[in-house]
UniProtKB/Swiss-Prot annotation:
Name of this protein: Queuine tRNA-ribosyltransferase
Functional description taken from the UniProt entry: Catalyzes the base-exchange of a guanine (G) residue with the queuine precursor 7-aminomethyl-7-deazaguanine (PreQ1) at position 34 (anticodon wobble position) in tRNAs with GU(N) anticodons (tRNA-Asp, -Asn, -His and -Tyr). Catalysis occurs through a double-displacement mechanism. The nucleophile active site attacks the C1' of nucleotide 34 to detach the guanine base from the RNA, forming a covalent enzyme-RNA intermediate. The proton acceptor active site deprotonates the incoming PreQ1, allowing a nucleophilic attack on the C1' of the ribose to form the product.
Cofactor names: Zn(2+)
Catalytic site positions: D89, D264
Gene Ontology terms: cellular component: cytoplasm; cytosol
Species this chain originates from: Thermodesulfovibrio yellowstonii (strain ATCC 51303 / DSM 11347 / YP87)
Amino acid sequence: MRFKILQKDGLARTGIIETQRGIIHTPAFMPVGTNGTVKAMTPEEVRQIGYEIILSNTYHLYLRPGHETIKMIGGIHKFINWHCPILTDSGGFQIYSLASLRKITLEGVEFRSHIDGSLHFINPEKAIDIQLALGSDIMMVLDECIPYPADEEYVEKSIKLTTEWAKRCKEHFEKQDTYQALFGIIQGGVFSDLRIRALEELLKIDFHGYAIGGLSVGEPKTDMYKIVKDISPLMPEDKPHYLMGVGDLIDVLHAVEHGIDMFDCVIPTRNARNGTLFTSQGRISIKRSEFKEDLSPLDPDCDCYTCKNYSRAFLRHLYTCREILSMRLNTIHNLYFYCRFFEKMRQAIAERRFQEFKKEWLPVLEKNFYQESNDFHHSLENY
């Protein structure tokens, strides 16, 4: 994997990540394909919209159909018919979400499946082996996702554990003959000094890219923004910077401003299934009665399949009837909106007008905004 910066505007930057399966233009958004599929979409549709990379969840694929099954079939790309890059997480966040069903030690983590209660054990070496079997293009180290709130003493112990796991992941990774890349994960809760210390330790290990993990888990937005502002500029300039699990576009703008290159989140797809849609005029809830006889397109400025073919009235009808087509049409639109937003943002950085872009979009993104719980994605079934 190679990373090249094409243009900078302040700390915001646009670039390309070169992988064996294709180029990823950054800043990049990765739709979440929990079980190997972006919900309600075919891989071909996701690609046609313009996405160059998706994220798949190691935890879910490990439990079913199983990483060995996917390896036998020929790897995750063949299995799901997606021939562009894939990033797999290590499963750390999903295991963290199990709370009472897990036990963490220096050796690894023991947990019970949320599906059938069966007992499992994953250590750093196994986390790498699972991702090797899946055949993703970018792998993540096993880490402990720190809950919020957490006191400083707990966080300090946790980052020592994550650092030790990162060393073991890298040592095991280096024994393999693979084209895959491995990213380290910076933990540390809301304590900037501990985050900086964690980053310094990861830099000694040396990874292909670096991720900020453990945010968007219930902490105030101001804390999230402060961590990104304090940490991102200290990450190696010549390697990708990834903010894990963050996808609210307001948060994205603040993060890109400080040098973040990669994002993933279930927001566009989950919101689509719940009837919340992003438009050039702000968010709308399609279930509202005001759209019952509205024959205008969802977003007059959008060229997606949904907006070119269907009215707000029809989309509301589908949603209130709980038709499966509602999920599909809404998801097509939200993913299209996100993809075009990132394209426009990259263009703004390339033309050195990112601040104008941010100033233009913040009021739009805040319009009709309803506060969504930061911990909505803690439920494994929400993926």
